[in-house]
């Protein structure tokens, strides 16, 4: 469940900023998703992904890249992670690791050795990895899925086209265990594709219908 709070935080974050506190579903039978949240992340890509996955009864852990302190995103929305990435990786395996985009957030993901370790571990187990907008370049930086079909925000294409089979004409691309998408406006389909892979097409369609969204698996 996501709830919007109004609260003051240090470092210039005021009551005027929206704060989203993430509370994990406690259903132990659910599939598990890890969303890594870095400062400067694209908040639509984060929020829609977390919300849609939870609507699909997927257990979502939101891990702050550096710690579990509030994270200011690209448009000054402030998100309170469930935990830190360091702590999240001690909690067991995840069925999917999700990377939201955002230029500053993606730069932090690219420069984090911890993110690289998580992604390589996930890839070695054949687990799903999902990246949207700028975040596929973090996959490239950490050596994930080289040669596979992917997409991204169009501005990222020059950094990716020599390493991957780049797809221009699809909003969401899946190649094996790698799911990629293009930007804020494609996040619903991105999150529904993850939902489909974890809990089935029928659940994904039911979630989409409840949101008045049309999803075609």
UniProtKB/Swiss-Prot annotation:
What InterPro entries would the database entry show? Class_I_gatase-like, DJ-1, DJ-1/PfpI, Prot/Nucl_acid_deglycase
Q: What happens when the gene is disrupted?
A: Double knockouts for dj-1beta and dj-1alpha is viable but with reduced male fertility. Double knockouts for dj-1beta and dj-1alpha is more sensitive to chemical agents that induce oxidative stress. Double knockouts for dj-1beta and dj-1alpha shows reduced lifespan and decreased spontaneous movement over time. Double knockouts for dj-1beta and dj-1alpha spermatozoa are morphologically normal but immotile with abnormal vacuoles in the Nebenkern, abnormal mitochondria and aberrant separation of investment cones during sperm individualization.
Q: Describe tissue expression.
A: Expressed in testis (at protein level).
Pfam families reported in the protein's UniProt record: DJ-1_PfpI (PF01965)
Question: What residues sit in the active site?
Answer: 133
List, alphabetically, the CDD domains matched. Answer: GATase1_DJ-1
Highest taxon in the source lineage: Eukaryota
Q: Does the keyword Cytoplasm apply?
A: yes
Where does the record place it? Answer: Cytoplasm; Nucleus; Mitochondrion
NCBIfam families associated with the record:
not_thiJ
Q: What is the protein name stated in its UniProt record?
A: Protein DJ-1alpha
According to its UniProt entry, this protein's organism is: Drosophila melanogaster
């Amino acid at each position: 469940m996501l709830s919007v709070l109004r609260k003051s935080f240090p470092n210039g974050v005021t009551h005027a900023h929206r704060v989203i506190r993430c509370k994990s579903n406690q259903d132990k039978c659910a599939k598990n998703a890890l969303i890594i949240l870095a400062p400067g992340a694209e908040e639509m890509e984060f929020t829609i992904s977390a919300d849609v996955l939870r609507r699909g009864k997927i257990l979502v852990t939101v891990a702050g890249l550096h710690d579990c302190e509030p994270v200011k995103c690209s448009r000054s929305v402030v998100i309170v992670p469930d935990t830190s990435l360091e702590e999240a990786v001690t909690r067991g395996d995840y069925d999917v690791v999700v990377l939201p985009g955002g230029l500053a957030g993606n730069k932090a993901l690219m420069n984090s050795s911890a993110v690289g370790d998580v992604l390589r571990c996930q890839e070695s187990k054949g687990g799903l990895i999902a990246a949207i907008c700028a975040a596929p370049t973090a996959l490239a930086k950490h050596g994930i899925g080289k040669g596979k079909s992917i997409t991204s925000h169009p501005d990222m294409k020059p950094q990716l086209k020599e390493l991957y089979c780049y797809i221009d004409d699809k909003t969401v691309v899946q190649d094996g265990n790698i799911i990629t998408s293009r930007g804020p406006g494609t996040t619903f389909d991105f999150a529904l594709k993850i939902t489909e892979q974890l809990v089935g097409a029928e659940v994904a369609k039911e979630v989409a219908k409840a949101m008045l969204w049309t999803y075609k698996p």
